[in-house]
């Protein structure tokens, strides 16, 4: 209750004090507003917008609040004009207007526009009536108290103008509300269009998600298959590793067994795990063996060439021997013919001596003289032939000496010998031709008819002829002696031939020594062959192990190929999974942001609804207080009528009035403090509202609000979205597919719902922000009327504000707790994402390792294929060489048969005369019997070859059979009884079942 004054105050003093107090209060309010207006952070955008009749001092802060300024904004949310009561008990016009505007906004949300208009008009009319009543009361009280009409009328005019301004502001707020309703309709249409677009986008998203689900199902199936194959591959790998370990043990056993034969093979078997080094060593060893084989082939080729040269030399020497034998036989025939001629001449001489008469003595003498000349010429020829034979003998001896030297010097000297022998052969052939001509002449002379018988009785001529015949006989005897000497010379030549044969035997012995050396070489080759057999066995075992290892490698290659395919499929699946996860993360982040914004908006709406309820309660309280004030004013008016009679008493009680003024000042200070506290709380609430809703700066700033909304949406899209939390108990792909489908569907539903809620909350927040802005623009202070009811109203509003602040604090704590929980959830999801990325990195490392192993195996396989191709090429080349050698051997056998035929023909010519022709075959046979050679005697034994010369095939030839037998013995050197006198060919051959010659490669 208001305190009752004991004495009425002086009118002049009370009016002056009232005006001074009002001026001081206005100044303090302005200073307070100026102090509170820079509470917005620096860089914020401030706008002063003066509406129709509104107070130009009211400003609206529309700056964007940063997260660092949220506590300040929360502290600066409440304004002092919303819920304050002046000390005089009259509610401030700003508070009433804000409460009425809030009620009108609430009614506009629920009731059509016509009801809003009627309510606004009724409220303005009621305000005007109240203002008129107050003006009348104030005027009457002023006129009754002191009669100062003009001052009180001026104050009343000020109040009327103030109330008119408030009414104009109310009309403008109505107009703005109407405009806001129009904008709300437009926004509803836009919202409908956006919802239609969202539905279309949802349909498209559903279609895309259906395709993605199918792909995801296929990928999950493939992942399951890959996992099963991975398990199978791991088991197969374990088996292969176990088998490889067993093989390693076996290889170590084999290495210990083969260590005594070949250390290299043992090293290769012990180092079975290091296949690459083993293969390189084996390649090196094979290269060394091929080099040794090539060296042996070169030596063998050189030996064969030397043997062929020796055979050619031997054949040439045999031809020379044959020529000499034929020349010797021809000379013997010539000697026999000469003996026959001598006998014939003796018979003729006897006939001439027996017959005395010779009618044709002159002719006979001439014939005898001619015969003598012929005999002398023949004798000279024979002497020349003897000399030539001696010269040839000397040359032959020199040639034999040269041959021994040539054997040491080999090919060059042998060619010179062949050249000299060819020259000698030509000379001897010329001599033989001369002898043949002489023989033909003698035969012609023998074929002439005998002369007629001479008359009996020797004459002088006959005696002369007889003397000449005796002389001729003597000459013939001398010739016979010369022939005997020549025969002796021939015997010497035969001795020389024997010596030459001995030398040939020595050469054959040297050849035998060479053969023994060849045997030693053969033994070395046998040892090498034994080593090679052991090596071949080891290599066969190694080859088997390599084949097994190749099988393992091929299986490993298959496994690696399958693993590569699996890993590629896994990579594609993981890529698709990542994309789906990113999309789901984006959707979930959008949903979370939408949820947060919807929660914030719902919280803001709840807080605004609470504030609206509080404002309505305060408005009702203010109406009740106003009614009380009007009743009290009537009572006071009656008291003022009574107090006119007590003016004197009031003058006496000035001191009491001063005390009352001081109490009013104190109450004004208390109300100012309460106003400051309320403004701080209002600023805090306004900061919370600006943080939650980001409303516009003032009245009708839809474009800036839309820009803020677009910025919020862009920030929601640009924020990195967490990965979806995939539960760990999803073992089957069906469960995973169902989980992803449900997650996508729920995300879409929540996204659509939260978008709708966000739009609704934004609309509500805009409305509330406009209402708050319009309410904040109203004047916040009025002149306090003297009374006694202000303390109770201020206490109730303070308690209501305290309750609202406690609710806001509790809600703020709940929001902070939810935010902390969400942060923990986000951190957990990020941890899961990091784990998934680590697993994908390990899978990528496994893939890289598989690829490197696969590349190494491919390189090894390629090297093996190249090595096999080189071996096949070498094999084909060796086959071609073997065919060429086989043809050469067959050609040698054919040449041998031809030489056999020649020797047989040469041996059959002197067979008719056993006395003279016997020594030649005996000599040839001696040459065969004395020479136990290791090479093929191409001259051969004449006696067994005579009966078999007609057979042309080399299979029926005993020498060829001997060659084949020797080849078999050479192939199996341990089973060979010995060389003996069997000839051999210095090549390595193999005879098959058909006795065909094939060269084997060691």
UniProtKB/Swiss-Prot annotation:
Residue numbers carrying Dimethylated arginine: 18, 30, 35
Keyword Repeat: no
Coiled-coil ranges (or none): 16-892
Biased composition (Pro residues): 1-11
Annotated stretches, region: Interaction with p115/USO1: 1-84
Residue spans of biased composition, Polar residues class: 52-63, 95-105
Membrane topology, record value: Peripheral membrane protein
Residue numbers spanned by region Interaction with GORASP1/GRASP65: 992-1002
Purpose: Peripheral membrane component of the cis-Golgi stack that acts as a membrane skeleton that maintains the structure of the Golgi apparatus, and as a vesicle thether that facilitates vesicle fusion to the Golgi membrane. Required for normal protein transport from the endoplasmic reticulum to the Golgi apparatus and the cell membrane. Together with p115/USO1 and STX5, involved in vesicle tethering and fusion at the cis-Golgi membrane to maintain the stacked and inter-connected structure of the Golgi apparatus.
Disease: Developmental delay with hypotonia, myopathy, and brain abnormalities: An autosomal recessive neurodevelopmental disorder characterized by global developmental delay and muscle weakness apparent in infancy, microcephaly, seizures, central hypotonia, and skeletal muscle myopathy. Brain imaging shows cerebral atrophy, thinning of the corpus callosum, and delayed myelination.
Subunit field text: Homodimer, may assemble into homohexamers. Homotetramer; forms a parallel homotetramer with a flexible rod-like structure that can give rise to I- and Y-shaped conformations. Interacts with GORASP1/GRASP65. The homooligomer forms a complex with GORASP1 with a 1:1 stoichiometry. Interacts with RAB1B that has been activated by GTP-binding. Interacts with p115/USO1; interaction with p115/USO1 inhibits interaction with STX5 and/or RAB1B. Interacts with STX5. Interacts with ZFPL1. Interacts with AKAP450/AKAP9; leading to recruit AKAP450/AKAP9 to the cis-Golgi.
PANTHER family (alphabetical): GOLGIN SUBFAMILY A MEMBER 2, GOLGIN SUBFAMILY A MEMBER-RELATED
Name of the molecule in the record: Golgin subfamily A member 2
């Amino acid at each position: 209750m208001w305190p009752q004054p004991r004495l009425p105050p002086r009118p002049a003093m009370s009016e002056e004090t009232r005006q001074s107090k009002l001026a001081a209060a206005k100044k303090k309010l302005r200073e307070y507003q100026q102090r509170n207006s820079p509470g917005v952070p620096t860089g914020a955008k401030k706008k002063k917008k003066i509406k129709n009749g509104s107070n130009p001092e009211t400003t609206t802060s529309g700056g964007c609040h940063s997260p660092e300024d949220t506590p300040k904004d929360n502290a600066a949310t409440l304004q002092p004009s919303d819920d304050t009561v002046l000390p005089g008990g009259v509610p401030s016009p700003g508070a009433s207007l804000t409460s009425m505007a809030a009620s009108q906004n609430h009614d506009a949300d629920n009731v059509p526009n016509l009801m809003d208009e009627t309510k606004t008009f009724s409220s303005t009319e009621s305000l005007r009536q109240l203002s008129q009543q107050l003006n009348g009361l104030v005027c009457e009280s002023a006129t009754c108290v002191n009669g100062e009409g003009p001052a009180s009328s001026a104050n009343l005019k000020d109040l009327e103008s103030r109330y008119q301004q408030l009414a104009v502001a109310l009309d403008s707020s109505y107009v703005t509300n109407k405009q806001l309703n129009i904008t709300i309709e437009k926004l509803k249409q836009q919202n409908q269009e956006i919802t239609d677009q969202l539905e279309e986008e949802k349909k498209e998203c559903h279609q895309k998600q259906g395709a993605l689900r199918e792909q995801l199902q296929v990928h999950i199936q493939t992942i399951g298959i890959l996992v099963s194959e991975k398990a199978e591959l791991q088991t197969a790998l374990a088996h292969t590793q176990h088998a490889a370990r067993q093989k390693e043990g076996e290889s170590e056993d084999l290495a210990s067994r083969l260590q005594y034969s070949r250390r290299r093979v043992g090293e290769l078997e012990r180092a079975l795990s290091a296949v690459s080094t083993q293969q390189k060593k084996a390649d090196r060893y094979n290269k060394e063996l091929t080099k040794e084989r090539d060296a042996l082939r070169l030596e063998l080729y050189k030996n064969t060439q030397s043997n062929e040269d020796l055979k050619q030399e031997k054949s040439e020497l045999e031809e020379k021997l044959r020529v000499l034998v034929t020349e010797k036989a021809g000379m013997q025939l010539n000697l026999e013919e000469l003996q026959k001629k001598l006998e014939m001449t003796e018979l003729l001489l006897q006939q001439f001596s027996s017959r005395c008469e010779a009618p044709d003595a002159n002719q006979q003498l001439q014939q005898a003289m001619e015969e003598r000349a012929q005999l002398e010429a023949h004798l000279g020829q024979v002497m020349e032939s003897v000399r030539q034979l001696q010269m040839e003998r000397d040359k032959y001896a020199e040639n034999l000496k040269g041959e021994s030297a040539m054997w040491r010097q080999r090919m060059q000297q042998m060619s010179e010998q062949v050249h000299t022998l060819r020259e000698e052969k030509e000379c001897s052939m010329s001599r033989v031709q001369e002898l043949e001509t002489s023989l033909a002449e003698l035969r012609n002379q023998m074929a002439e008819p005998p002369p007629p018988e001479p008359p009996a009785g020797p004459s002088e001529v006959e005696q002369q002829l007889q003397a000449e015949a005796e002389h001729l006989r003597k000459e013939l005897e001398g010739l016979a002696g010369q022939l005997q000497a020549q025969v002796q010379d021939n015997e010497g030549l035969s001795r020389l031939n024997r010596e030459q044969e001995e030398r040939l035997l020595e050469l054959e012995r040297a050849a035998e020594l060479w053969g023994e050396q060849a045997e030693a070489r053969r033994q070395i080759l046998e040892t090498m062959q034994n080593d090679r057999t052991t090596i071949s066995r080891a290599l066969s075992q190694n080859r088997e192990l390599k084949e097994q290892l190749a099988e393992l490698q091929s299986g490993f290659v298959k496994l690696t190929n399958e693993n590569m395919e699996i890993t590629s499929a896994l990579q594609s699946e993981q890529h698709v999974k990542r994309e789906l996860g990113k999309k789901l993360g984006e959707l979930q982040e959008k949903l979370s942001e939408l949820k947060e914004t919807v929660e914030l908006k719902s919280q803001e709406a709840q807080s605004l609804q609470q504030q609206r309820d509080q404002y309505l309660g305060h408005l009702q309280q203010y109406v009740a207080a106003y009614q009380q004030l009007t009743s009290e004013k009537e009572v006071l008016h009656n008291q003022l009528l009574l107090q006119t009679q007590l003016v004197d008493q009031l003058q006496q009680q000035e001191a009491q009035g001063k005390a009352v003024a001081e109490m009013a000042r104190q109450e004004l200070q208390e109300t100012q403090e309460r106003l400051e506290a309320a403004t701080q709380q209002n600023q805090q609430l306004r900061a919370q509202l600006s943080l939650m809703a980001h409303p516009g700066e003032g009245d009708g700033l839809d474009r800036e609000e839309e820009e803020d909304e677009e910025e919020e949406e862009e920030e929601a899209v640009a924020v990195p979205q967490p990965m979806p939390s995939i539960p760990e108990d999803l073992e089957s792909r069906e469960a995973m597919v169902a989980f992803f489908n449900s997650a996508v569907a729920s995300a879409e539903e929540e996204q659509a719902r939260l978008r709708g809620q966000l739009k609704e909350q934004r609309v509500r927040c805009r409305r509330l922000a406009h209402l708050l802005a319009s309410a904040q623009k109203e004047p916040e202070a009025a002149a306090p009327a003297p009374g006694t009811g202000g303390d109770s109203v201020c206490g109730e509003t303070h308690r209501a504000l305290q309750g609202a602040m406690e609710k806001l604090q509790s809600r703020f704590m709940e929001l902070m707790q939810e935010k902390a929980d969400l942060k923990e959830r986000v951190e957990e999801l990020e941890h899961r994402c990091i784990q998934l990325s680590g697993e994908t990195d390990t899978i990528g490392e496994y893939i890289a390792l598989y690829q490197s192993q696969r590349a190494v195996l491919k390189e090894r396989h390629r090297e093996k294929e190249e090595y096999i191709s080189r071996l096949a090429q070498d094999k084909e080349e060796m086959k071609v060489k073997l065919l060429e050698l086989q043809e050469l051997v067959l050609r040698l056998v054919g040449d041998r048969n031809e030489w056999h035929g020649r020797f047989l023909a040469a041996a059959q010519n002197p067979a008719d005369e056993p006395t003279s022709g016997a020594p030649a075959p005996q000599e040839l046979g001696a040459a065969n019997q004395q020479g136990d050679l290791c090479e093929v005697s191409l001259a051969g034994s004449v006696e067994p070859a005579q009966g078999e010369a007609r057979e042309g095939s080399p299979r029926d030839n005993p020498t060829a059979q001997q060659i084949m037998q020797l080849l078999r013995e050479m192939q199996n050197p341990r089973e060979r009884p010995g060389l003996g006198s069997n000839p051999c060919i210095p090549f390595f051959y193999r005879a098959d079942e058909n006795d065909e010659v094939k060269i084997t490669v060691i």
